[in-house]
C-alpha cells in the first residue's frame, strides 16, 4: 500500500501539483540476519524514482551526520522529501560514534565521509600516502564498518574507503575532489552488501564513472564487488 503513496504523491507531488513536502521516512535497511523481509527498504526503488531533484536519499553512518541531516531538513528554505536508510545494528556499533563537537553549529551535514584511518586519533592503521594507495573502495551505509574491520584485520595499508552519505542528489563534484589524489595509481571499486540488482549500484555507477573521467583516472572503469543478482 505504501508504494502507491510514495510513487503517486511523495515522489511526484511537487512536479504534478506544485505541492512541496518535507516528509522524512526512516526505513530499516541492512543485512542483519533477520531475513529478506527485514533486510531491505528497497533502496533501489527509491533511487529509480529520483529525478529533477525531487527526493533526498541518505544512508548515514554517524550520529552527527544523521543529526545534521534532520537539522538541515528543518532549516532549509525549501521542502523536499527525505528518505533515510537506518540499519539497526549501527545503534550499538562501537565505531559508529561522534564527538560532541561534531553536533555543534561549526559542523554540518557531510555528503561524503572519509576513511577513519585518515584521522590518526582514531587508533586505526596508518595508510600509505595517496600515491601508494592501490585500491579505493566506495560504499554507502553500514557495510563501511564491515570493510573497515576486514582491512584492520588484514593490516592492509594500501586500501582506502570512502562513504557516500547522500545517494541523491549525488555529490559527484565532492567525490571527484576526494578521489583526485588517487587518480594515478589506484583501482576504483564500488562495494555493497545488497545483491547486484538491488541497492545503489545501478544508480551510482554512471555518476562514479563521470567522476573518474573528470579526474582523468588511469584506471577509469569502476568495478563492482558484492552479491550476485538475487530474487530476494
Regions found by a protein language model. Give the residues of each.
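Generic structural signal for well-ordered alpha-helical scaffold segments
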Residues: 10, 14, 71, 176-180
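Extended catalytic/binding region for NAD+/ADP-ribose chemistry, centered on the ART fold
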Residues: 1, 56-61
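Thiamine diphosphate
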Residues: 1-22, 28-48, 68, 76-79, 92-232
Amino acid at each position: 500500500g505504501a508504494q502507491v503513496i510514495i510513487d503517486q504523491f511523495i515522489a511526484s507531488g511537487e512536479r504534478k501539483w506544485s505541492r512541496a513536502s518535507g516528509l522524512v521516512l526512516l526505513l530499516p535497511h541492512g543485512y542483519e540476519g533477520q531475513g529478506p523481509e527485514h533486510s531491505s527498504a528497497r533502496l533501489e526503488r527509491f533511487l529509480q524514482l529520483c529525478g529533477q531533484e525531487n527526493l533526498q536519499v541518505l544512508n548515514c553512518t554517524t550520529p552527527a551526520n544523521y543529526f545534521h541531516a534532520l537539522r538541515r531538513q528543518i532549516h532549509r528554505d525549501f521542502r523536499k522529501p527525505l528518505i533515510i536508510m537506518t540499519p539497526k545494528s549501527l545503534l550499538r556499533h562501537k565505531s559508529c560514534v561522534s564527538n560532541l563537537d561534531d553536533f555543534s553549529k561549526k559542523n554540518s551535514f557531510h555528503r561524503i565521509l572519509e576513511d577513519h584511518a585518515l584521522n590518526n586519533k582514531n587508533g586505526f592503521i596508518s595508510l600509505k600516502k595517496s600515491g601508494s594507495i592501490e585500491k579505493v573502495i566506495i560504499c554507502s551505509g553500514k557495510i563501511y564498518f564491515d570493510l573497515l574491520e576486514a582491512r584492520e584485520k588484514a593490516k592492509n595499508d594500501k586500501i582506502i574507503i570512502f562513504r557516500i552519505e547522500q545517494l541523491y542528489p549525488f555529490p559527484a563534484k565532492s567525490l571527484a575532489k576526494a578521489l583526485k589524489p588517487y587518480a594515478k595509481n589506484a583501482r576504483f571499486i564500488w562495494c555493497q552488501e545488497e545483491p547486484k540488482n538491488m541497492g545503489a549500484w545501478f544508480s551510482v555507477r554512471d555518476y562514479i564513472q563521470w567522476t573518474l573521467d573528470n579526474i582523468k583516472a588511469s584506471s577509469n572503469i569502476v568495478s563492482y564487488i558484492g552479491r550476485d543478482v538475487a530474487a530476494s
